[in-house]
């Protein structure tokens, strides 16, 4: 692939890690952000210490505070911003673009209130004449490992296979490998909903439960993620792949996961407001829990784990009471679509 100009919208941990992957592949990387001090740090010190204290970035990676300058002559634009601000930022990008580009995103969540997936938001806010079909970049990946070039395998999903292949080639190298998929709904819902289960898995750890309980919540969590995804039109096989069970494992078992850490703190009895303040980063699983719970109610999809976590976070339900309620649900067969 010839050298590409890629604008990375969002200088967070994952945006920074993906910028390094693209730079390693010989592409011109322009990171855009709205915090002047952070932009100056990336350009002058070649660091982003808020997220990576000991990492020095290649000096060829440039950061911009001016959005039009970051987007100038870009071949592709990668959104890596929190779900709750995606629509606002997409509007800004649409206004600043003056030519057609490939549009990708690597965020995981459902928009509050609308319950929309991120690709849908981008389709609504960026005119078709300015973009390709949206490509979702998702899968089992910790920024802390990707930034040190640890082996990582993820998925590039798009309605248009050729566009997905473009992104596959754009990112893939000796330590970072992408597989293509055309099931955008499946890949996006898997990436968003696994954050809920990760909060629950962390809570079990914080309460002192062992591996049996953690395996239970991951596998039964995958079942209800699949139920909702299929209701929305996803291919159930997607959930057995990298963006499904792969991402659920990596997020639901690791201290690198901010969702797992948030759940762990909840399990230890900490208050949610204190957890969010101490984390200093967006915990997507918190807002996604509400969106998924409301969506499940609307579509009549059985999601007992999501419902339990919703009650704990938004209705001040005692965690142990929520667990007791799940464990005393009506007996089911494992392979029933409606079973726990």
Swiss-Prot record:
Q: What PANTHER family does this protein map onto?
A: GLYCEROL-3-PHOSPHATE DEHYDROGENASE, GLYCEROL-3-PHOSPHATE DEHYDROGENASE [NAD(+)] 2, CHLOROPLASTIC
Q: What is the lineage of its organism?
A: Bacteria, Bacillati, Bacillota, Bacilli, Lactobacillales
**Name of protein:** Glycerol-3-phosphate dehydrogenase [NAD(P)+]
In the Enzyme Commission scheme, what number(s) does this protein have? 1.1.1.94
Give the species this sequence originates from: Streptococcus sanguinis (strain SK36)
Q: What does this protein do?
A: Catalyzes the reduction of the glycolytic intermediate dihydroxyacetone phosphate (DHAP) to sn-glycerol 3-phosphate (G3P), the key precursor for phospholipid synthesis.
Family, per the entry? Belongs to the NAD-dependent glycerol-3-phosphate dehydrogenase family.
| Key word Ribonucleoprotein present | no
Q: Where does NADPH bind?
A: 13-14, 108, 143, 258, 282, 284
Cystine pairs annotated here are none
The UniProt gene name for this protein comes to gpsA
Signal sequence span per UniProt?
Answer: none
Q: State the Gene Ontology terms under molecular function.
A: glycerol-3-phosphate dehydrogenase [NAD(P)+] activity; NAD binding
The principal location of this protein is cytoplasm
Q: According to the UniProt record, what class of enzyme is this?
A: oxidoreductase
Under catalytic activity, the entry for this protein gives: sn-glycerol 3-phosphate + NAD(+) = dihydroxyacetone phosphate + NADH + H(+); sn-glycerol 3-phosphate + NADP(+) = dihydroxyacetone phosphate + NADPH + H(+)
> For this chain's UniProt record, which GO biological process terms are given?
carbohydrate metabolic process; glycerol-3-phosphate biosynthetic process; glycerol-3-phosphate catabolic process; glycerophospholipid metabolic process; phospholipid biosynthetic process
Q: Can you tell which superkingdom this protein's organism belongs to? A: Bacteria
List the catalytic residues.
Answer: 194
Q: Which PROSITE patterns match?
A: NAD_G3PDH
Ordered alphabetically, the record's keywords are: Cytoplasm, Lipid biosynthesis, Lipid metabolism, NAD, NADP, Nucleotide-binding, Oxidoreductase, Phospholipid biosynthesis, Phospholipid metabolism
Named in its record, the pathway it takes part in is: Membrane lipid metabolism; glycerophospholipid metabolism
Q: TM segments? A: none
**Residues bound to sn-glycerol 3-phosphate:** 108, 139, 141, 194, 247, 257-259
Q: Which InterPro entries match?
A: 6-PGluconate_DH-like_C_sf, 6PGD_dom2, G3P_DH_NAD-dep, G3P_DH_NAD-dep_C, G3P_DH_NAD-dep_N, NAD(P)-bd_dom_sf
Q: Where in the cell is it found?
A: Cytoplasm
Kindly give the Pfam families that the UniProt entry links to this protein: NAD_Gly3P_dh_C, NAD_Gly3P_dh_N
Q: Which GO terms describe its cellular component?
A: cytosol
């Amino acid at each position: 692939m010839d050298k590409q100009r890629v604008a990375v919208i969002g200088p967070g941990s994952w945006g920074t890690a993906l910028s390094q992957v693209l730079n390693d592949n010989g592409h011109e990387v322009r990171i855009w952000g709205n915090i002047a001090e952070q932009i100056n740090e990336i350009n002058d010190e070649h660091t982003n210490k808020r997220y990576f204290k000991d990492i020095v970035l290649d000096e060829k990676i440039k950061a911009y505070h001016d959005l039009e300058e970051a987007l100038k002559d870009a071949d592709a634009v990668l959104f890596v911003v929190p779900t709750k601000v995606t629509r606002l930022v997409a509007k800004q990008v649409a206004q600043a673009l003056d030519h057609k580009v490939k549009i990708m995103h690597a965020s995981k969540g459902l928009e509050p209130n609308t319950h929309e997936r991120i690709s849908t938001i981008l389709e609504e806010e960026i005119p078709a004449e300015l973009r390709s079909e949206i490509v979702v970049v998702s899968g089992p990946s910790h920024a802390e490992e990707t930034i040190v070039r640890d082996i990582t395998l993820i998925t590039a999903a798009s309605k248009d296979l050729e566009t997905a292949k473009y992104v596959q080639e754009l990112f893939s190298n000796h330590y970072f490998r992408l597989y293509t998929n055309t099931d955008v709904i499946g890949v996006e819902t898997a990436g968003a909903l696994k954050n809920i289960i990760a909060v629950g898995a962390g809570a079990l750890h914080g309460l002192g439960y062992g591996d049996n309980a953690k395996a239970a919540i991951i596998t039964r969590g995958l079942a209800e993620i699949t139920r909702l995804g299929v209701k929305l039109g996803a291919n159930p096989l997607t959930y057995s792949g990298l963006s499904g069970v792969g991402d659920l494992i990596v997020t639901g078992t690791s201290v690198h996961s901010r969702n797992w850490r948030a759940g762990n703190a909840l399990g230890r009895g900490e208050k949610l407001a204190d957890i969010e303040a101490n984390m200093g980063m967006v915990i997507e699983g918190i807002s996604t829990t509400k969106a998924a719970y409301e969506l499940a109610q609307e579509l009549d999809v059985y999601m007992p784990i999501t419902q339990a976590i919703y009650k704990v976070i938004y209705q001040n339900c005692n965690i142990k009471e929520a667990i007791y309620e799940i464990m005393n649900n009506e007996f089911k067969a494992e392979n029933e679509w409606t079973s726990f």
